[in-house]
Design a protein with these regions (language model features):
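Sec-dependent N-terminal signal peptides
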Residues: 4-16
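Subset of outer-membrane beta-barrel
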Residues: 22-307
Length: 307
């Protein structure tokens, strides 16, 4: 009976792996962190750009999802070549996934716009912390939970990004390969696949008057065998210094956003998600914080970027 209970606990922990392997983590402030969803974004902005994002989903619930994203990118060779480096940490329950991605992009310049083609390579490490499972009231030793399990995968992504001063649109697949983790030690025989996810995003910046800009944007997610999800957002900016935004996620969530250009090179962002489903008091809230740095050549002036 005790062994059966242990097996059930392990299988429950693997549910997080299956869900995480089938869909990449979502971000409310995707429009300010383009490299996280499209490798072709690398080198599309002025100077050296670095982003750090933290997302806490359903705080107050043990084992709730948490995501940390850090990336940096810049352009080279007269802005024809872009390169970027990303790190992602996703945690849910006793499972966590660490991913390092190296992206490269080639930018074609037109009269008033650019078109970029990007590729990326991903290395992911999955870890199951069985030693963190509370399997008995007295927390007595059990060899079933003595070891932690891990598995690694390699994947590749691709994307296209078209952008101008007032408009942008992109199509990407951050991970193309169907890596099957079902036969690995960490799944315990449960189905776990890295299924490709197609991402489509677009946005337009409308100058309502000399001091106010309005930016509608959309992100569409499509995974084979799953419903199509989308995020629809509208952000308003005053003097490109402070911005307020609202959004709707088709998977039943409302989003509120606040941004502030605290320094010519530093932007702060905060997003609050409110779940519309009946998941309980704590499971209805998600918080997201973004810190963005833009560093140009010494003495150069860089205009605040709205995407």
């Amino acid at each position: 009976m005790k062994n059966m209970k242990n097996i059930l606990l392990i299988m429950v922990s693997f549910i997080g792996l299956e869900l995480a392997a089938q869909q990449d983590p979502q971000y409310s402030m995707y429009m300010f962190n383009g490299l996280a969803i499209n490798p072709a974004y690398a080198g599309s902005a002025e100077g050296i750009n670095a982003n750090v994002l933290y997302r806490s989903q359903w705080p107050g619930i043990d084992g709730a999802p948490n995501t940390i994203v850090a990336n940096v990118h810049r352009a080279f060779m007269d802005e024809k070549i872009g390169a970027g480096l990303s790190f992602n940490n996703d945690q849910i329950g006793v499972m966590d996934r660490n991913t390092i991605s190296l992206a490269g992009a080639y930018h074609l310049k037109f009269k008033y716009s650019k078109l970029a083609f990007g590729l990326q390579a991903n290395y992911s490490q999955y870890n199951i912390g069985l030693s963190r499972v509370q399997h008995s009231q007295d927390n007595s030793a059990d060899p079933t939970f003595a070891a932690n399990l891990s598995e690694s995968t390699i994947n590749f992504g691709a994307g296209v990004f078209y952008y101008a001063d007032k408009f942008y649109a992109g199509l990407s697949v951050p991970a193309i390969l169907n890596n099957d983790l079902s036969a690995t030690e960490i799944t315990g025989g449960q189905q776990a696949l890295e299924v490709p996810q197609f991402l489509y995003n677009a946005g337009y910046i409308w100058a309502a008057d000399p001091m106010i800009d309005i930016k509608p944007s959309i992100l569409i997610r499509h995974t084979s065998g799953a419903p199509i999800n989308f995020d629809l957002n509208v952000n308003a900016y005053y003097k490109k210094f402070i911005g307020l935004g609202v959004g709707y996620r088709s998977s039943n969530a409302l989003v509120a956003m606040l941004e502030c250009q605290v320094h010519p090179y530093v932007k702060l962002g905060y997003a609050y998600d409110r779940e519309l489903t009946d998941l309980g008091v704590f499971a209805r809230h998600t918080h997201e914080v973004l810190l963005r740095f833009t560093m140009g050549p010494k003495g150069a002036q860089i205009s605040p970027r709205l995407y």
